Amino acid sequence: LEMNLPNAVVETVDVRQRDQIAEAVTNGEAAHGPVDMMFVNAGIARLADIGRQPPEEWDEMIDINTKGVMNTVHAVMKGMMERRRGTIFMMSSIAGRKVYPDHTVYCGTKYFVHAVSESLRDYLSDYNVRVIVLSPGVIETEVLSGVLDQQTLADYKANKIKMGGGISAEIVADLILNAYNYPQEAIVQEICITPTRQKF
C-alpha cells in the first residue's frame, strides 16, 4: 500500500450503497476483529451560487453527505451497542455551525451531521458508546476538487490565501487520536479547530 500499512484492509465502496459499507465492515472485522472506532467521513463539497447551481449537485451532496453518513453509522452501531464499547467520529464542518456564501446545500448537510451527532450521542451514551463530532475550518485536503463552479473556487482560494492557508490534516488527525485515547468513560463531545487567522 502507498501508506505502508501492510495489515490494512482496503475496500472501495459507494457510501450511498448501505450493503457495500456493511460488506466492507464485515471484511475488516473478519481480518482484525470488531470495529472499535469508525471515522464517518462521507462528504463532498459542491460549492456554488445557489441561484445558478444545478439541482443535481444538491442531490449528490444530500445523498453522500447525509445518507452516506447514516449508512456508515448503521454498519457499526449495532455491534458497538452489543459490546457496549466503541467510538464514532462524525466529520462535520464549521459549516455545520454557521452559514457561508456559496455553501447553501453543503451547510445544510453539515447541520444535518451536527444534529444527528447530538441525537446519536444522547442515544448511544446508554450503551457506553461515544459519538464525537468534528467541526474543522479550512484544512489542507482535496475537498476543493469537488468544487465545479470556477468563480466560487477562485473566491475560496483567495480567502484561503488571505488567512495564510489551511491547517494540515495531520493536526486534525492528532486531535482525533488524542480524543480516542481517552478512557471509554470520558468523551470530548466536539472538536472545533480552524486556522488562527480564519475569521469566519
Residue spans for each PLM region:
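Active-site-adjacent segment of SDR/Rossmann-fold oxidoreductases
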Residues: K98, S119-V129
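Substrate-binding pocket helix/loop in short-chain dehydrogenase/reductase
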Residues: D49-I50, P54-I62
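The beta1-alpha1 cofactor-binding region of Rossmann-like NAD(H)/NADP(H)-dependent oxidoreductases
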Residues: T12-E23, P55
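Residue(s) in the substrate-gating loop at a strand-loop-helix junction
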Residues: S93
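Active-site helix of classical SDR
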Residues: V73, T109
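Active-site loop immediately N-terminal to the catalytic Tyr-X3-Lys motif
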Residues: G51, K98-T104
